[in-house]
UniProtKB/Swiss-Prot annotation:
Gene3D superfamilies: 2.30.30.790. It comes from Chloroherpeton thalassium (strain ATCC 35110 / GB-78). SUPFAM superfamilies: Translation proteins SH3-like domain (SSF50104). GO terms for molecular function: structural constituent of ribosome. This is Large ribosomal subunit protein bL19.
Length: 121
């Protein structure tokens, strides 16, 4: 990529994004503009994919709302993202968790939780 493009992108990239991996349960605070008002909307779900590099990096977060699966593709460095919180770390063996789309009921949101060294002590 051109050096000038890299410089412009580096200036616009966010530094407050936590380390996230597929299988993590996230809370994404999204700014929503309705008329002349602006409010925060919370979207909590499982991170099922990460794609792209740099400014074009996006994440796909999936949740079950009233028995219906809802997925949201979110650009990571977008100004509409207020903050991203990691609720819990998931232990998965895949980079893309598209198989979660075929699950129903409780199994649709069930992922093993990753244990850390601080929890073991």
């Amino acid at each position: 990529m051109n050096e000038k493009i890299k410089l412009v992108e580096a200036a616009q990239m966010r530094a407050d994004i936590p380390e996230i991996h597929p299988g993590d349960t996230l809370k994404v605070h999204v700014k929503v503009v309705e008329g002349d008002k602006e409010r925060l909307q919370l979207f909590q779900g499982i991170l099922i994919s990460i794609r792209g590099v740099g400014m074009s990096k996006t994440i796909t977060v999936r949740k079950i709302s009233h028995g219906v699966g809802v997925e949201r593709i979110i650009p990571l460095h977008s100004p509409i993202i207020e903050k991203i919180e990691v609720v819990k770390r998931g232990k998965v063996r895949r980079a893309k968790l598209f198989y979660m789309r075929n699950r129903t009921g409780k199994a649709a949101m069930k992922i093993k939780e990753k244990t850390t060294n601080s929890e073991m002590a």
